[in-house]
Amino acid sequence: MLKKNEIIILDGATGTELHKLGLPAGVCPEEWILAHPDAIKTVQAAYKNAGSDAVYAPTFGANRKKLPAHLDVYETNRKLLQLCREAIGTDTFIGGDISPTGELLYPMGMMTEDELISVYEEQIKAFYDFGVDFIVIETMMDIREVKCALLAVQHIYQDKKCPVFVTVTLEETGKMLTGTDPLTALLIAQAYGADAFGFNCSSGPDKMIPLLDTLVPYASVPLITKPNAGLPKETDGKTVFSMDAEEFKKYVRYLVEHGADIIGGCCGTTPEYIKAISDLKIPVMPISKKQFSFVSSRRETVFPDEATKWADFTLTNDTEPEDFCYDLADADCDAIRLQIMCDETVLTAFLEGLSLTVTPPILYQTDNKALQKLIYRYDTGASFIE
């Protein structure tokens, strides 16, 4: 999909454009779209005509946790993908869109990671059978949701490759809702197979420039920005945004100069904004595979060197997993070296218990392939295995 030396232009704010065409507040957007197919076709054709190289299909909330019970997940996604294809033709890329389910993962909520993976697999199976050009995992607020979605893609796309974009949304703290900083999110997403990474919603383009500066030294994949049209404000009972298309275009140039390769718009960005982006003719920064060592928990990353303070632990079959997790969380160190000397049952219980605690990043030590597979599946960060 990537064009040599040129940015890829995504679409803009589909939801707000649909509201202009009659989508009421509080209804299921996917169900409304199926009942009003001309509305989504109008919006997506407008973005294509404005210069979008790739358009997100309206499958954002088309999962079993958000859809009404009478709608079949597979059929709903298939129909929404078909409407998108009819709107944009075959010369524009179509992306299957995945978003948060609205339910929190355990222990903040009741949903398990295994259940979330199965929820996403239902959508992705429809993407696979339809033949989408790429998949986007967007507006993610919990890095574990990102990991589950990427694992679901791996489970469905075992015999062919489909590019996967990941974009997260940040709070005013500069971190995801569950505390993951942008660099850690990038490293975890890359480790689990993301083909591009970045940000959507959250803020205007001006606030995304320093975020790119943080990521570029460590990014081995293209970087995405899909910002809002500045800050929202209420005017005459309506939400309007602070940046017009020309000011947005000015900042998009800065985004590209600071490392963005794939650019679109989120809240408040109409086809006019996408047209402004498409008028830009500026080269993108070359992407290279970065070589460095790191260990990440879900909230922090350590780049080991001579000054790194390590704590050494051993996990055995005699270990009580939950208490052990708290021992690790209390360790006075930068990172943990954990020798695995237990069976799969104890390791699984330990890894599941990590979701209850915030531990320093862990470097796992085992040459057992079955145990390595469990670590890849259940670890809450992205940690190397020795």
Model-derived segments and their meaning:
Residues 1-386:
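Domain-level signal for soluble alpha/beta catalytic cores
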